[in-house]
Amino acid sequence: EDLSDVVYYADLSEWQEIFAVLCTYAKQEDFSVLAERLGQRLEDRYLHSVQLGTPALTDRKNVVLCYLAAGCLEKVMSMWIEEMQEEEYAIKSGNTQRDNSPYSAHAEALQTLMEKVVVFQHAVQYTDEDLQPPVPNDDGTVPVREFKLAPLYNYILEYVNVLAEQGLLVIALKFVALTPPAYT
């Protein structure tokens, strides 16, 4: 309970110390929940700074770190999608030394996002519950599913199209497997 109080009430300017305390003293079964809560507090602060028009990108990176440590793909996904959109804009704007056509910019930003997702899934042995078959109701009907990673699935399917257009069908099929069969 003491660690929970630290996460909930400690000054966020000391977030690194809070994180170090969690890494050192949190029980394994409590760590993810506490790291996620710390990430949520940091994300709230980050979103508040965005609303004020003064977003601190270091805050976003800190949020991502906490969510990664917690193994929360659902939470880190929104941050990565935001980064992907910024990367795509930077490429299109010509702020890089790369091909800045809209298609190339989007494909490159998508690839960066997919690399992050795949590395994350392997690093934390993430299991996507939405890839499991749905449990039928008592009457035998299958419930309508809401996919918590729907925004990510949309980008995965876009990436599948990019890969298929390049003739990389074997790789495209591996990415299709990262989306639920019932997802459309």
Task: Give, region by region, the residue ranges found by the protein language model.
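Extended alpha-helical solenoid/arm regions of large eukaryotic scaffolding proteins
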Residues: E1-T184
